Amino acid sequence: MARYFRRRKFCRFTAEGVTEIDYKDIATLKNYITESGKIVPSRITGTNAKYQRQLARAIKRARYLSLLPYTDLHQ
């Protein structure tokens, strides 16, 4: 049987030494939402709980200010 080796998940924000996730940083936030607009869970991305909470808060603020869409385009 072949064994599959998964890449170890790590928190990018901890590695880079980020103190606060900013809602205006749309390029970073887009990496953590799906095509349909859902927030990707930390078990998929490997983000720490502290940064996952900040990430969710930043995404919700960006959505409220219409910097990010709530859903996809519904075509």
Swiss-Prot record:
Keyword annotations of the record: Ribonucleoprotein, Ribosomal protein, RNA-binding, rRNA-binding
GO cellular component: cytosolic small ribosomal subunit
Gene3D superfamilies on file: Ribosomal protein S18
InterPro entries for this protein: Ribosomal_bS18 (IPR001648), Ribosomal_bS18_CS (IPR018275), Ribosomal_bS18_sf (IPR036870)
Single GO MF descriptor: small ribosomal subunit rRNA binding
GO biological process, one term: translation
UniProt similarity note: Belongs to the bacterial ribosomal protein bS18 family.
Stated role: Binds as a heterodimer with protein bS6 to the central domain of the 16S rRNA, where it helps stabilize the platform of the 30S subunit.
Oligomeric and partner information: Part of the 30S ribosomal subunit. Forms a tight heterodimer with protein bS6.
Protein name: Small ribosomal subunit protein bS18
Gene: rpsR
